[in-house]
UniProtKB/Swiss-Prot annotation:
Keyword Chloroplast applies: yes
Primary gene name: ndhC
Subcellular location: Plastid, Chloroplast thylakoid membrane
Protein's recorded name: NAD(P)H-quinone oxidoreductase subunit 3, chloroplastic
Gene3D superfamilies referenced in this protein's UniProt entry, alphabetically: NADH:ubiquinone/plastoquinone oxidoreductase, chain 3
Broad class of enzyme this protein falls into: translocase
Major subcellular site: plastid
Organism, as annotated: Carica papaya (Papaya)
GO molecular function, one term: quinone binding
Superkingdom of origin organism: Eukaryota
Its membrane topology: Multi-pass membrane protein
Record-annotated membrane-spanning stretches: 9-29, 64-84, 88-108
Its EC number(s): 7.1.1.-
Family the entry assigns: Belongs to the complex I subunit 3 family.
Keywords: Chloroplast, Membrane, NAD, NADP, Plastid, Plastoquinone, Quinone, Thylakoid, Translocase, Transmembrane, Transmembrane helix, Transport
Length: 120
């Protein structure tokens, strides 16, 4: 028999975890001082007055390296728990992890061939 009250803890956690950030934003909005002036609106660069144009364009290569780094960082996050419990999980999980690593290798070879890893 399916009983709805089995999920009371989940709903309480959901309500509390949603209310805390909302209350934090509301309280900071009410208690924060409102001081708008020329000093508040000026940009700050390591304690000195900014010189020149503040608009800089970054090369797309930085984004490509960052994207490849994030992909392999997420791979590490997924593979670390698997490696810690390798002896308990069995062969089927080993095959799944192997497929996961093969997909990542195919993705890295694709990025390499597209020139995303070359700095030119």
């Amino acid at each position: 028999m399916f009983l709805l009250y089995e999920y009371d803890i989940f709903w309480a956690f959901l309500i509390i975890s949603s209310a805390i950030p909302i209350l934090a934003f509301l309280i900071s909005g009410v208690l924060a001082p409102i001081n708008k002036g020329p000093e508040k609106l000026s940009s700050y660069e390591s304690g000195i007055e900014p010189m020149g144009d503040a608009w800089l364009q970054f090369r797309i290569r930085y984004y490509m390296f960052a994207l490849v780094f994030v992909v392999f960082d997420v791979e590490t996050v997924f593979l670390y728990p698997w490696a810690m419990s390798f002896d308990v999980l069995g062969v089927s999980v080993f095959i799944e992890a192997l497929i996961f690593v093969l997909i990542l290798i195919v993705g890295s070879v694709y990025a390499w061939r597209k020139g995303a890893l070359e700095w030119s």
